Curated annotation (Swiss-Prot):
The keyword Kinase does not apply. Residues 23-40 have a biased composition (Basic and acidic residues). It is found in: Secreted. Residues 1-23 form the signal peptide. Disulfide bonds join C56-C62. Keywords: Amidation, D-amino acid, Disulfide bond, Hydroxylation, Ion channel impairing toxin, Neurotoxin, Secreted, Signal, Toxin. This is Contryphan-Mi. The modification 4-hydroxyproline is found at P57. Its main location: secreted. Its target is unknown, but this toxin may modulate voltage-activated calcium channels (Cav) or calcium-dependent potassium channels (KCa). Residues 24-54 form a propeptide. The modification Cysteine amide is found at C62. Exists in two forms, due to cis-trans isomerization at 56-Cys-hydroxyPro-57. The cis conformation is the major form.
Length: 63
């Protein structure tokens, strides 16, 4: 039983070390990247734009 506990602990240490090493890679392109807004109006703005083009039946809410 003691050997099994040691084996499980060693496996856990190896896995956590592997995760730390993989997550520690330097990614300069991501670090210096400027976030861009692909949808300037946002999701609701896009939805409202579709409603305006298709003829919105709810005039008070369509703007």
């Amino acid at each position: 039983m003691g050997k099994l506990t040691i084996l499980v602990l060693v496996a856990a240490v190896l896995l956590s070390t592997q995760v730390m090493v993989q997550g520690d890679r330097d990614q300069p392109a991501d670090r210096d990247a400027v976030p861009r807004d692909d949808k300037p109006g946002g999701t609701s703005g896009k939805f409202m734009n579709v409603l305006r083009r298709s003829g919105c039946p709810w005039d008070p809410w369509c703007g």
